[in-house]
Each structure stands twice: as structure tokens, then as C-alpha cells.
Amino acid sequence: MAASETIEIRRETAQVPYREALDAMASRNAAIAEGTAPELIWLLEHPPVYTAGTSASPDELLDPRFEVVEAGRGGRYTYHGPGQRVGYVLLDLRKRARDVRGFVHALEGWVIETLADFGVESWRAEGRVGIWTRGADGREAKIGAIGVRIRRWVTMHGFSVNLSPDLAHFGGIVPCGIEEFGVTSLAALGREVTPDQWDEALLSHLDGFLARLDTPCPPEAA
């Protein structure tokens, strides 16, 4: 078990350009793998950008009104921008259960627990990556995205949660390749949550998230 006290927590107040964050993640991933830098939880926002995962299809890019960047993570297209909190999670799974599926499951659970702190019930959906809830219209909608990469058993990328982004910006893509469902946010659900409030709530669940990484994910939790 690796304790949270050894993990660097970085909370940005200014927007970080996506390419800059991508380069920083790659460097930190390598340093963690070499044992020359501590693990990192990095919480931030980006200027508007569309990012393409390794499974992204060109026909899912409907209106590239913002820069499009190859992210190198799993998944398809997603949008990042102001009002959306992104969490980059760089952890050494050699110190924990070497279980990629278990890592993703625990990451989803971490976000779901934090959303519950703000009165939003959310869930995983079989066959659909991400975090789901009921939108203001009562229909199922996506409130958070998950995308990870593992290099030398050190994780990269992580999650994003819609606090109060301009939801119209998602119209330039088919988010995560899923056409039949929309997107929502905490603000659209009547919850005004600042980045600082989100970070504090998220980090209050950090120890529980890390504890789940010490045990392989059970088959029924796929």
C-alpha cells in the first residue's frame, strides 16, 4: 500500500494549455517510473480543446471549432474547457494491484462518491465509459468522462467532470462516440460548485480511492 502522504497534490487556478499538460504528464510519468519523482494528482482546467483518444473516428468530429489534439489515451473524442475540472492521476501501480480494469473502476467510484457530496446521484453504465446521471429533463446524460493510459505500470490522464462548462461546446463532437445521450453539468442540475469546492470534496475521498487500488477488481465489477 502506498500512502497519500507521499503523493504530490497540485491544484491549478489558471487554465493550463492542453499540449503543455500533455508534455508535463509524459515527463512526470517517465520520472515516476524511474523513481525520480513522486506520484501526482493534478487538478486543473484547460482552454477550449477537443482531444482524440486512440479509438476516435473522424466522422465523430462534427464541427472542429477548437483545436483538436491527439491525446494518446484510450477512448474517443472529448471536450475540455473552462468550467470543467480535469483530474490527471499519475500513480505507480507497481506499488498496488497491477490491475488496469480495477484502476478504472476505482477512478469511476472516486468521481461518483464526490458527486454524491453535492447531492448528485451518478453511476457507471454497462457498455458506456464515463459517469452518468439524470439531466434536468430527466433523461440519462453524461456528467463525467474517463480516459486513461498506462505506461510501465504508471498511470496517465484520468477524469473530467462538468462543473459549469458551456455545454454547447460539446456539439462539435460526438462525445465519447455515444450519439444517443447528451451531456449535463452540476450547474445545469442547479448545483453551483467552484473548482476549489470540487477539489476539497474529491481529496476528502482520496484515501478510500487509494485503498481500492490495493485489491484486484472483482469480475462482477467490470
Curated annotation (Swiss-Prot):
PROSITE patterns: BPL_LPL_CATALYTIC, LIPB. GO terms for cellular component: cytoplasm. CDD domains: LipB. Pfam families: LplA-B_cat. It catalyses: octanoyl-[ACP] + L-lysyl-[protein] = N(6)-octanoyl-L-lysyl-[protein] + holo-[ACP] + H(+). In the reaction, the free carboxyl group of octanoic acid is attached via an amide linkage to the epsilon-amino group of a specific lysine residue of lipoyl domains of lipoate-dependent enzymes. Catalyzes the transfer of endogenously produced octanoic acid from octanoyl-acyl-carrier-protein onto the lipoyl domains of lipoate-dependent enzymes. Lipoyl-ACP can also act as a substrate although octanoyl-ACP is likely to be the physiological substrate. This is Octanoyltransferase. It comes from Novosphingobium aromaticivorans (strain ATCC 700278 / DSM 12444 / CCUG 56034 / CIP 105152 / NBRC 16084 / F199).
